């Protein structure tokens, strides 16, 4: 699985890798977001046993590296924490025109399974309880 690391929160890349490795039983390549590239060597040390056994690789680069990896035949699924714009570029195509055309036709450029958290859209559950007005 390709894990495209987040740029907004440093810890998310590690969480995403651990989830893919242990919850989904995937071998992973983590492409660090350039904003958090400084964290790559630290994750490399923390995950050294996984890297040594071939379960994880950490790579660096910009959008062109991410696009190349997303299209690589050895990558069978993708996880992204990022923007809707990046998701659309990976799944539907590079330009807004290509994306509109492909969305209308229902023909994604990339047909690999993609999981994504885009724009910090997280579920919130409200459980009835004895809350004060302030709570």
Task: Please report, for each region that a protein language model flagged, where it lies by residue.
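Conserved small-residue-rich beta-alpha loop and adjacent elements
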Residues: 1-54, 121-122
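Conserved NAD(P)+-binding/catalytic subdomain of aldehyde/semialdehyde dehydrogenases
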Residues: 49-135
């Amino acid at each position: 699985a390709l894990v495209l690391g987040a740029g907004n929160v440093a810890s998310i890349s590690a969480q995403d890798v651990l989830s893919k490795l242990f919850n989904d039983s995937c071998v992973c390549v983590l492409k660090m977001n350039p904003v958090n590239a400084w964290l790559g060597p630290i994750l490399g040390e923390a995950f050294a046993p996984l890297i040594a056994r071939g379960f994880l690789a950490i790579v660096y680069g910009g959008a062109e590296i991410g696009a190349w990896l997303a299209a690589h035949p050895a990558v069978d699924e993708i996880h992204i924490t990022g923007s809707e714009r990046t998701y659309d570029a990976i799944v539907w195509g590079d330009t807004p025109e290509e994306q509109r055309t492909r969305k209308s036709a229902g023909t994604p450029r990339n047909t690999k399974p993609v999981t994504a958290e885009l724009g910090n859209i997280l579920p919130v559950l409200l459980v009835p309880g004895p809350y004060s007005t302030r709570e």
